[in-house]
Amino acid sequence: ILVLIAISAFINPSKSAEQSELLKINWTFKGLTGKFDRASLQRGFQVYKEVCSSCHSMQYLSYRNLGEEGGPEFSIEEVKAIAASFEVEDGPDSQGEMFTRPGRPSDRFVSPYPNVNASIAANGGAYPPDMSVLVKARPGGANYIYSVLMGYSEKPMDFKLEDGVYYNKYMSGNKIKMSQPLSEGIIEYTDGTLATEDQMAKDVTTFLTWAAEPELETRHKTGVKVIIYLILLTTLVFFSMKRIWSRVDTEI
């Protein structure tokens, strides 16, 4: 699922097609002091695991990252349980054969397909992009991902769609080869939050943003410290120079 968020199908756009301006959300992670909502990150991972991971890989993430500071911050036990819920190919064994085993925290996220050709064949000729850094790879970033997820609607009467193509007002040409991935009730959040389409879109977008920028909170904290340091340094230099020049003026 989520196929072609990154590689939309530009199939003879209709003259009446107009790409709408992206939705703008007041994300908690934006701004100088922005930080991720832990609960949203954990829910976003659940959306990825139960909806997106059937088609999309996240090859740059390991399960242990889910327990690191600044991320979803699952407990060690939760991370182990999450990893163990996946089967990982390993080997060769003493007989030279490959085998499968339960995942470990050190393992990379398991890909839904064994190779690129298999993923293309399973998705009608389209390659479902890896989602590890998808937010950084798209103009508009988080707002783009959220808008596309929320952009499905009935097409205008005079708008032509080919078979296997869907109308999305936030795509260029308003056409996309990905069926609507989110709908209310498609999953049940473990924390009891109502899984509305809007809530799931925000949560998975937050999770994908963290995946693309896992050091965001550390960078923001460092930035604040640097600004405070520069303000103090500038103030110290100003008053030091003022005192030095006052002595020079007196001597003159």
Name these PLM-found stretches.
Residues 31, 61-62, 68, 74-107:
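Acidic/histidine-rich catalytic neighborhood
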Residues 87-173:
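Membrane-proximal low-complexity regions enriched in glycine and acidic/polar residues
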Residues 170-172, 178-213:
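Extended, hydrophilic extramembrane loops/domains of integral membrane proteins
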Residues 219-224, 228-252:
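Juxtamembrane interface at the cytosolic side of transmembrane helices
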